[in-house]
A protein has these predicted regions:
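Sec-dependent N-terminal signal peptides
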Residues: 1-15
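A beta-strand edge to alpha-helix "cap/lid" segment located at domain peripheries
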Residues: 16-70, 75-165
């Protein structure tokens, strides 16, 4: 049944959006680069992870609490700047925080697989407005995912806000 879901996810992803991704699989000790435009059985899971990362960006715009409850594992840890918070704080910030996200998308994502654990790195670009007016932010992110009970959940995330130039 998982193969059907994966096939549907891959079929709905536009070829031009896949081109911005790079996937890395880890069959042994050293990761091997995999061409994301021609997914193999080995990197199908990487494609699922990239889709989940894109769901995260869309969820920010929609303030989608249900999505984040599914994605964030119990015990999830998030750090940025000078704070580290847990799952409940992140859910609250996304749903009721002061910022309104009008656009959010990922760029240059890479997946590094280690069995049932994966690390996804990339850029998250967010535009919107908040109490101080309009904003355009670019974050460098590192997300750690674990596959449990036939699904991927994020267990840890770190975002670094790149200072405006």
């Amino acid at each position: 049944m998982d193969w059907l879901l994966v096939a549907l996810l891959l079929a709905t992803q536009a070829p031009d959006s896949r081109a911005k991704y790079s996937a890395m699989a880890t069959p042994g000790a050293e990761p091997t680069a995999v061409d994301a435009q021609a997914p193999s059985v080995q990197d199908t899971e990487a494609q699922v992870l990239l889709r989940l990362e894109d769901d995260w960006a869309l969820g920010l715009r929609r303030r989608d609490a249900a999505l984040f409850r599914r994605l964030l594992a119990d015990g999830f840890v998030y750090s940025e700047d000078d704070r580290t918070v847990g799952r409940d704080d992140v859910l609250r910030d996304i749903v009721t925080g002061p910022d309104t996200v009008e656009e959010a998308h990922n760029e240059e994502m890479k997946v590094h697989r280690f069995g049932t654990t994966a690390i996804v790195t990339g850029w998250l670009v967010v535009r919107g407005h908040g109490p101080k007016g309009p904003f355009s932010r670019r974050y460098r992110f590192t997300d750690t995912w674990v596959r449990r009970n036939q699904r991927w959940q994020i267990v840890g995330a770190h975002d670094y806000l790149v200072p405006a130039r």
